[in-house]
């Protein structure tokens, strides 16, 4: 939309975008473009306005399988197939891959299942922590963030982490980012 959440009213993932809200998709469509959106879309009960789905794909794959490990491959394959087809007019395509968002699942699911492949095999391969990692006294805003709430519970899983846990987290995050980079390269 080009507007801030407080302007369009979608301040959390569970709120829909107003139906009359212009989007880049609707503006470009009105200018004669074919407009498509594929991938992660965290706004309920509405399809990205001003866009078409790539046929056979947009059925809220994230809700059915929230892990990018599975959905990103399907998204990339569909996008590549779409891009190979001849176009009769200019197009605008938004591709919203899930990763590196899987890092949240890595935290919450105790690094189980397939996410193990993003865990280091040897400790000497762990990245160093940033110079500003150590905090002498936790700032007030961090104390507020760590309080129980309906959304964003990831912090409760990290409260007792040691430095090595954070290094493993960074390692996994870097691998997921590399996977994203690889997927973009395929497109």
Where are these regions (language model features)?
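Catalytic-site neighborhoods of secreted/periplasmic enzymes
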Residues: 1-93, 97-119
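Active-site-proximal cap/lid insertion segments
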Residues: 85-87, 97-187
């Amino acid at each position: 939309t080009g507007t801030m959440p407080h302007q369009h009213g979608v301040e959390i993932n569970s709120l829909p975008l107003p139906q009359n809200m212009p989007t880049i998709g609707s503006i470009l469509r009105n200018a004669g473009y074919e407009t498509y959106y594929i991938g992660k879309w965290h706004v309920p009960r509405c399809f990205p306005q001003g866009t078409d789905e790539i046929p056979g794909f947009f059925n809220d794959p994230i809700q059915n399988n929230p892990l990018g490990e599975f959905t990103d491959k399907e998204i990339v394959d569909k996008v590549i197939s779409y891009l190979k087809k001849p176009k009769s007019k200019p197009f605008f395509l938004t591709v919203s891959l899930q990763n590196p968002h899987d890092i949240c699942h890595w935290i919450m699911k105790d690094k189980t299942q397939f996410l193990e492949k993003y865990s280091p095999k040897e400790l000497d391969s762990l990245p160093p922590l940033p110079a500003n990692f150590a905090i002498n006294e936790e700032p007030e805003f961090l104390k507020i963030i760590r309080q129980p709430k309906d959304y964003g519970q990831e912090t409760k899983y990290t409260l007792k982490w040691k430095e090595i846990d954070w290094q493993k987290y960074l390692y996994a995050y870097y691998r997921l980012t590399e996977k994203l980079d690889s997927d973009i390269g395929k497109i």
